[in-house]
């Protein structure tokens, strides 16, 4: 079963999220992870996603009005090609059903 969990420093897989963030994006594309954790003044959603109990990846959304931008989306390298990214995008659509979604 695919599930999502809001990312916090106390999340069991916090270290995995942080490591994936650092490995999936080059330094010039990253912003300090503390900004993601703080949620951009209530406009951000930092979400880890799982297949059952297995950590698959994370996404970070920034929403203003009816516009949601996917700033970061990463899947664990060993799980790529198994539909986790597709399910993450479906989860985003479920979280923001009335919003236009942008993936840069």
Place the predicted regions along the sequence by residue.
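Short amphipathic alpha-helix that is part of the acyltransferase structural core
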Residues: 1-31
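Conserved acetyl-CoA-binding loop-helix of GNAT-fold acetyltransferases
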Residues: 75, 81-94
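Conserved GNAT acetyl-CoA-binding A-motif
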Residues: 95-104
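Short coil/turn segments at beta-strand junctions that form active-site/ligand-binding loops
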Residues: 45, 66, 99
């Amino acid at each position: 079963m695919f599930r999502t969990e809001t990312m916090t420093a106390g999340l069991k897989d916090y270290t995995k999220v942080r490591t994936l963030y650092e490995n999936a994006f080059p330094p010039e594309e990253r912003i300090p992870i503390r900004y993601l954790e703080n949620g951009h003044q209530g406009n951000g959603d930092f979400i880890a996603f799982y297949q059952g109990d297995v950590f698959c990846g994370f996404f970070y959304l920034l929403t203003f009005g009816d516009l949601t931008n996917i700033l970061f989306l990463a899947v664990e390298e060993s799980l790529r090609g198994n539909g986790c990214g597709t399910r993450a995008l479906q989860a985003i659509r479920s979280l923001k059903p009335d919003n236009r979604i942008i993936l840069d």
